[in-house]
Amino acid sequence: MSKLILIRHGQSLWNAANKFTGWVDIPLSRRGRAEAMIAASKLQEQGYRIDVCFTSLLIRAMETAIIALTEYEQLCGGKTPIFKHDADDLDWHGWDKYDGDPKEELPIFPSQALDERYYGDLQGLNKAQTAQKYGSEQVHEWRRSYFTRPPGGESLEDTQKRVIPYFENRILTHIAHGDTVMVAAHGNSLRAMIMRLENLQPEDVPNLELATGIPLIYEVDQQAKVSNKIVLH
C-alpha cells in the first residue's frame, strides 16, 4: 500500500483578511507558517517518510511544502528537498539541467495544474462584503458549487479537468511504485482530487471542507483505490 498525504497550504495573508485569493500569489501568514510546521511535526511523530512531493506554482503551497520538508528533516529521511521544474510550467527557465540523486534528494514537482481555482472578478474582494453585495446564497454557490462559475472565473468542474489528468499521469505513477507522496495544494484543487479518490458526486461537494494545514492521509493501492483515510488534527 502507498500513502498519499494531502495538505491544504497554511493560512495565507488573504485567508487572514477573508479575501478571495484564487491565482493571486499571496504568501503565508505567520500563522500559516506555524501551521506548516505543526503539520510536519505530526507527520514525523507518526513515522511518515515522504518520497516525493507535488505542489502548485503558487507561493503559499510551495512555502508549505518547503517549510515542512526543511524544518523536520526526518520527514524526508534526511534528504535534501529540490524543486524540479517542468518545461510546460510558466516558471521553467531551462537552466535546471540536473537529473539529481534519488539517494540524497527528495524531488518537489511544482505544477500549474494544481493551482487554486481561478476566482476571476472576485479575486481580491472581501468575502463578507461580496456576500452583502450579491447575497450569501449566491456567494456560497460561487464558492462551493461544482458547476457554477464565479464571474470571469473557473468552476470546480473546470478545476477538476486540469487536476485529474495531472493526478493520473504524474502523481499516480509514484503511487504505483509504492512511494509515499505528499501534495501541498489548495482547497479546490484538493477537492477535485478527493472527489476522484472517494468517488464523490457533484452534490457532495458543498459539504467538503478542508482546513488549512491539516494533513489528510490516504492509504491506496496502485490504482489509488482507497483502503483507509486518516485526518491528523
UniProtKB/Swiss-Prot annotation:
Pathway assigned to this chain's UniProt record: Carbohydrate degradation; glycolysis; pyruvate from D-glyceraldehyde 3-phosphate: step 3/5
Pfam family of the protein (one): His_Phos_1
Positions annotated as active site in the UniProt record: H9, E116
InterPro entries found in the cross-reference section: His_Pase_superF_clade-1, His_PPase_superfam, PG/BPGM_mutase_AS, Phosphogly_mut1
Keywords for this protein: Gluconeogenesis, Glycolysis, Isomerase
GO molecular function ontology, one term from the record: phosphoglycerate mutase activity
Top-rank EC class of the record's enzyme: isomerase
Binding site for substrate: 8-15, 21-22, 60, 116-119, 127, 143-144, 187-188
Gene3D superfamilies, per database record: Phosphoglycerate mutase-like
One GO-annotated biological process of the protein: glycolytic process
Keyword Isomerase: yes
Feature type site, description Transition state stabilizer: H186
CDD domains noted in UniProt: HP_PGM_like
Enzyme Commission number: 5.4.2.11
Transmembrane segments: none
Catalysed reactions, semicolon-separated: (2R)-2-phosphoglycerate = (2R)-3-phosphoglycerate
NCBIfam families assigned to the protein according to its UniProt record, in alphabetical order: pgm_1, PRK01112.1
Protein family per UniProt: Belongs to the phosphoglycerate mutase family. BPG-dependent PGAM subfamily.
Entry function: Catalyzes the interconversion of 2-phosphoglycerate and 3-phosphoglycerate.
Protein name (database record): 2,3-bisphosphoglycerate-dependent phosphoglycerate mutase
